Curated annotation (Swiss-Prot):
Gene3D superfamilies found in the cross-reference section: 1.10.10.200, 3.30.70.980
Official protein name in the record: Probable transcriptional regulatory protein AAur_2300
The species this protein was found in: Paenarthrobacter aurescens (strain TC1)
Chief location of this protein within or outside the cell: cytoplasm
Compartments (UniProt record): Cytoplasm
NCBIfam families listed in its UniProt record: PRK00110.1, PRK12378.1, YebC/PmpR family DNA-binding transcriptional regulator
Lineage, highest ranks first: Bacteria, Bacillati, Actinomycetota, Actinomycetes, Micrococcales
Sequence similarity: Belongs to the TACO1 family.
Amino acid sequence: MSGHSKWATTKHKKAIIDGRRAKSFAKLIKNIEVAARMGGPDLAGNPGLELAVTKAKKTSVPNDNIDRAIKRGAGLTGEVVDYTEIMYEARGPQGSALLIECLTDNKNRAASEVRLAISRNGGTIADPGSVSYLFARKGVVVLPKNGLSEDDILMAVLEAGAEEVKDSGENWEIHSEPSDLQAIRDALKEAGIDYETDEAEFVPSMQVDLDVDGAKKFMKLVDALEDLDDVQNVYSNADLSEEVQAALDSE
């Protein structure tokens, strides 16, 4: 799930790693195909493709797979790549809100599978606009702290368009407008600071704390959604207190 690192830490113990990795590869490949279709196969002239390829390489997607995806998306193999982006809105346990971002070649299948996963796992599908207003599209760069202070990060990226630096446990998160992501990446490289991920994400304006029971139900719902091939990202305003996280980690 895109968003808070506490979820990633907790879910890591419960995930079947190889299966998740394979699904992650497939979703990264789909992003490359779409970017190549929209802007062509040249990384230098297609920032969206360059970003998709960089992300895939950071996740160890083999170069051969990346090259084939670029050619397929750009129409150089004769195959037709035609995906549609769809966003679904949902309510989860204890007032939590979710945005489910899909990339699909079959809208009816995606709608049916997403609705079924939500209804079977304690959520409810929401009307368009009733959840999305709780989120804003932001560029998010995540980097390990590695002894760096908030001021160290701000000095490196403030002039590149960074809006804020947030403490996210073991990591720092830099938030910006999505259009400033490239400038922030360049500023970090110039400062010699390594980062882990850089994404355009939907960031909640406020977060909702879940108790242990709510967190378990929420993770079950998100797992079911992320298992769907058409689902690219799940964004939420759900959060965990340190006490709830400790209780989950102890199980």
